[in-house]
Structures are given as C-alpha cells and as structure tokens.
Amino acid sequence: MPTTAATEVSPDNLEQYRRELTGYCYRMLGSGFEADDAVQETMLRAWRAADGFEGRSSVRSWLYRIATNICLDMLRGRQRRALPIDLGPASPPVEALLGDWSPDDIWISPISDAKIVPEHGDPAEIAVARDTIRLAFVTALQHLPARQRATLIMCEVLKMPAAEAADTLGTSVAAVNSALQRARATLAALPEEQRPASVDADQSELLAKYVDAFQRYDMDQLITLLHDDALMTMPPYSFWVRGAGDIVRWMQEPSPSACRNSIMVPVGQVNGSPAWAQYKPDPAGGHQPWALQVNEVSAGRISRMTFFLETERIFPAFGLPPHLG
C-alpha cells in the first residue's frame, strides 16, 4: 500500500519538474542530448521508487538527489566538454588550418530555451534561468569538478540554502560552503574569453541587420555589426577565430563560401540567445543544412558567434526541416 507521501510521486506531479531538472542536468553535463537522457532516467527511477518515498524531504529535493547521482555517474572518468576557445589559441582565417572534426562527445551542445526557461513566473527567475544556460556560462562550469559543479548550480543558480544542498549531495553544510568557495575561485581565475560576459537585453534591431547582411553576403555591412574582439567558433572543429576582421576574412575565404546565398531560418532562443538555422545552397537544388548559429550581443555589437555544424543530429532535435526547396 503506497504511503501518503508516495502518492505525491505520480507521473503528473513529477512532470512539473521536468524543465528545471533539464536545466540542472544540462548545466551539469553540457549536452542537450545527455540532459534529456538524464532527466528521463530520473523520472523513471523516481516512479519505480515511489512506494519507498517517505516524505522526509520534498519531492523536488528527492528528484534533485536522484538527478545528481545520475549526472555524477555519467561524468565519472569522462573528458570535460568544451568549446574550441578552451582548447587552444585563435587561428588565422585560413581554410587550410581548419583540420578535422573532433568527436562530438567533447563539445558543448546547444539546447532550446523552451526546454528549460519557464514560460511564466517571476521575471528575475526567468532571467537567471536564461543567463545560466548561455554557452559561455555552461562551458565555464565544465572546468569545475563534478561535485563542485553541482554545489555551485544548486546554491548560485537554484538558490538552494546550504543545508538543502548538503542534504541533496549527502554531505555537510561546511563541505558545501567550502566547495562553493573553491568553485567561485576557479571560475574567477579563467581567462577572460572563457568567462561569462554580460549581454545586451535589447538585441532585435542589431540582429535584424545582421541577418539581412548575412543573407545578402554584404561583408562590408556585417563587419560593422561585430565587436572588434568578437569570437567565432565552429564545433566540432577545434579551429576558432578572434576579431571582426578575421571573422569576415574567414567568411570570404572558403571557395565556394558556405555563407554566400545562405538562408537564415529563425529558431527562437537557444542557450539564452537568439539563434538561426543556416541553410546553404544545395548543388542539386534548394538549400541544405549548414549550421545552427547562436550569437551573443554585448556593448551594442555581436561578441560571440557559434556555428554548430553537426546538423544531422542538431536539426532534427530542433524540429528543423532537412532541406529547403
């Protein structure tokens, strides 16, 4: 006979936690695909263990304990995920230096805001949810040991009291405070390009100009929209470029350029930033997938451009068509 507490662990009751658990697992794992798997496993384990839930903690805390254990198991013995700027210096904009694709399991992968950010609620909480899935923030988190990462997310992002975080992690309040202090110090010591930067809230006019210039292949206009020290990465390549001039030279370098005559399809918010599906001309006709573009804006210009090129995995995950006629 299920206990009164166990009746709280119904599928409908568990489902209300899916978004925030997805956000937690994504920040822990750095992969939208793995976050989905981890949350699904969390729900399954919770449902199977429902009869044993005694209500000594809230359902939410119990779910976070399960999700944390799953994430720690998934991270054990694994190389941290990264973006190209973590792995080496910027390259000159020369196609011959592009190199080969690296395995997909070393890269941060994108995720739609719709899977994590609440549709309604406190605007401040929505802003925190969005800011803490930005690519730079999620990448910075991967520099932390897994338990420090969990501690920082619980205390800084989810605003859990230290006692609740300690209970969830199965440790003491003193250990939580110590881990939090070490995690903050690690993030503060990262090189500037690897640290999260503040982003502009009102981006619409600038980004509309960017899409227009990109689709017209107007590099003279596009360079005026980029920050002088803008960064461009293209996972799964380790290659990356720094500076507006080098970015534009790169877009003009490959022959034929994948940027020329592209079509940009809005995708909505991805990792807290506006994103587009870029389709390049298909020699057989129409346009074929080329990249998911995620751009960040700071100080009135585009400061980071990430082109996710693994379209065979990413486009289906975002419900994007495999071809434009």
Enumerate the language-model features and the residues they cover.
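Sigma70-family region 2
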Residues: 31, 41-59, 73-82, 142, ...
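A short, charge-rich alpha-helical start-of-domain segment used by transcription regulators
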Residues: 1-23, 33-36, 47
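Charged, low-cysteine interdomain linkers and short loop/connector segments
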Residues: 85-125
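Hydrophobic alpha-helical bundles that form the membrane domains of multi-pass transporters
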Residues: 33, 51-53, 65, 88
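Arg/Lys-rich amphipathic alpha helix in sigma70-family domain 2
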Residues: 68-86, 94-101, 189
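Short, small-hydrophobic-rich alpha-helical interface motif
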Residues: 21, 35-46, 63-67, 136, ...
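C-terminal and inter-domain tail/linker signature
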Residues: 19, 30, 44, 56, ...
